[in-house]
Amino acid sequence: MAKKKAFIPLLCLTSIVFLPWCISFTFKKSLESWITHWYNTKESEIFLNTIQEKSILKKFLEFEELFLLDEMLKEYPETRLQNLRIEIYKETIQLIQTNNQDHIHTILHFCTNIICFLILSVYSIRGNQELIILNSWVQEFLYNLSDTIKAFSILFLIEFCVGYHSTGGWELMIGSVYKDFGFIPNDHIISFLVSILPAILDTIFKYWIFRYLNRVSPSLVLIYDSIPFQE
């Protein structure tokens, strides 16, 4: 009976975590060939954002400069110049194909994220019973922990999310979200989000600690306050 009681919340957690990913991954694989064919055969202007334009232009200029430098050093005849034009043409085709693949992956990532969001939304609306079971299991698990372990876990979570060393992690996470949804990365917006999101989370954590925990477990708040290396 105890094993069955522990298995049900674990099954609910597994379904919430892996079900959206499995469905979106299957959808992505099934649409990949169709989107690739559609993107490579459609007759429309290629859209490049500023970052992509600079990246492709930089690669092309570097490639061209290398061949021109080679020509200046070797001073080969016209046949060598003809080979140079052919190589530049091949490199241009390669850059276009690479750019197309980047756009295809952006479209697929965007569709995958939308599908995951829709699945989680439906799950939160229709899966009330599973969420109630999971919530009760989490509360029971936390209740059985000692106050010292709870205080240590809270402090570790706060330092991990809003500590002075968490800036790099926030930049990486926000940049990944930008790339997944196909947005143009903006250093000013990313810097603003990196500075404001940890402050918001820090405020929420402290409000939760001194509002909720002070009522539920005063001893836990005392242990947290007694830790000398907290901010």
UniProtKB/Swiss-Prot annotation:
Entry's transmembrane regions: 7-27, 104-124, 154-174, 189-209
Gene Ontology biological-process annotations: potassium ion transport
Entry GO terms, CC: chloroplast inner membrane
Subcellular location: Plastid, Chloroplast inner membrane
Keywords: Antiport, Chloroplast, Hydrogen ion transport, Ion transport, Membrane, Plastid, Plastid inner membrane, Potassium, Potassium transport, Transmembrane, Transmembrane helix, Transport
InterPro entries: CemA (IPR004282)
PANTHER family in alphabetical order: CHLOROPLAST ENVELOPE MEMBRANE PROTEIN, CHLOROPLAST ENVELOPE MEMBRANE PROTEIN-RELATED
Similarity-based family: Belongs to the CemA family.
The protein, known as: Potassium/proton antiporter CemA
Organism the protein comes from: Pisum sativum (Garden pea)
